[in-house]
Regions:
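Conserved structural core of kinase catalytic domains
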Residues: 23-63
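Activation segment signature within eukaryotic-like protein kinase domains
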Residues: 68-69
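Protein kinase catalytic-loop region centered on the HRD/HxD motif
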Residues: 73-86
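Conserved C-terminal C-lobe helix
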Residues: 199-214
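A conserved short helix/loop substructure at the end of the activation segment
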Residues: 210-224
Length: 224
């Protein structure tokens, strides 16, 4: 939720998981409760990722992509390590973009702001899903990015089911592909190399190679 004027707007977090994992700098916090029940962020501009992507002609530059990967990674790491929780998948507008100032060269920050797909990680490193995804309500703008194992479970239409907590890593990889080359599904190996030729052997290239592994246990969220 955003409020305010053109000069300053605010976003209010009410999810304990997202408040505790929030990757935004504390300088942007205008209010934070001691018991992690309320956090308000102040920024020059706040917008959903779909709007930011549209303004950038459906292509994010390398540095912006790197920043987004790092900030989402910080959130996922906090959820996993500090809270023993994970995310099944991401939609495009599960990510919100926060601008520190009105100029184009000011800092841009990214954060997961939808808690709907957060679940406990069990002893087998899995997340249990007990409620259905309402696929009919998904808009073409708010695209979903599902891992192969998640798509398989959705096709079965049976509840409950379980997913490895690294399902989210694959989802982030697909989201990054969409933000860079407007592809919402993983291309085959030869096309992957062609599409990513401008950034081959860079940190983001190797990051995508690691998170887009078919076997969840082989996925690594590393961008160094």
């Amino acid at each position: 939720m955003t409020t305010g004027t053109e000069q300053s707007v605010s976003y209010h977090f009410s999810s304990e998981e997202l408040i505790r994992s929030c990757p935004l700098p504390t300088s942007m916090f205008s209010h934070k409760s001691h018991n992690h029940t309320s956090l308000t962020i102040r920024a020059s501009k706040i917008e959903p990722l779909s709007a930011f992507l549209k303004r950038n002609k459906k292509h994010l530059e390398y540095g912006i992509m790197e920043n987004m990967i790092e900030m989402i990674g910080r959130q996922l790491h906090n959820l996993e390590v500090e809270q023993n929780k994970g995310i099944t998948s991401l939609h495009l507008d599960d990510i919100t973009v926060f601008h520190s100032g009105p100029e184009r060269d000011t800092a841009i920050y990214f954060a997961i702001t939808n808690e709907a797909n957060i679940h406990e990680i069990d002893d087998d490193n899995e997340l249990e899903i007990t409620t259905p995804h309402d696929l009919s309500k998904q808009s073409t703008k708010n695209i979903a990015f599902y891992s192969p194992e998640h798509k398989e479970q959705l096709s079965k239409k049976v509840l409950p089911y379980k997913l490895h907590f690294k399902s989210s890593y694959y989802s982030v990889g697909l989201l990054c592909m969409y933000c860079y080359v407007s592809r919402s599904s993983k291309p085959d190996d030869s096309e992957f190399e062609t599409l990513l030729a401008p950034i081959i052997n860079t940190k983001i290239y190797w990051f995508l190679k690691q998170v887009l592994q078919e076997d969840p246990s082989e996925r690594r969220y590393i961008c160094v």
